[in-house]
Amino acid sequence: TRKQPNCNVYRSHLFFCTRQMDPICGTNGKSYANPCIFCSEKGLRNQKFDFGHWGHCREYTSARS
């Protein structure tokens, strides 16, 4: 299994990310296109979320109406 991304690698160029697709799901339930974008959102915006797993987040819909 892959380790979570090392956000220190992206510190010098936050928000100057490529369009490479390597999706990450954050613990906030939001999908990020790649580790650079994930780290940028987490670092610069001081958000309270962490790495969830590699791949897109699954959207859960409630069966209740």
From Swiss-Prot:
A Pfam family this chain is assigned to: Kazal_1
Chief place where the protein resides: secreted
Function description: Inhibits acrosin.
Protein name as it appears in the record: Seminal plasma acrosin inhibitor A1
Tissue: Seminal plasma.
PROSITE patterns to which the protein is assigned, alphabetical: KAZAL_1 (PS00282), KAZAL_2 (PS51465)
PTM info: The identity of the O-linked saccharides are not reported in Ref.1. The O-linked polysaccharides on Ser-12 and Ser-62 are probably the mucin type linked to GalNAc.
Compartment(s) of residence: Secreted
Site positions per UniProt: Reactive bond: R19, Q20
Gene Ontology MF term list: serine-type endopeptidase inhibitor activity
Glycosylation: residue positions: S12, S62
Disulfide bonds: C7-C39, C17-C36, C25-C57
Keywords for the protein's UniProt record, in alphabetical order: Disulfide bond, Glycoprotein, Protease inhibitor, Secreted, Serine protease inhibitor
Domain Kazal-like, first and last residues per copy: 1-59
GO cellular component: extracellular region
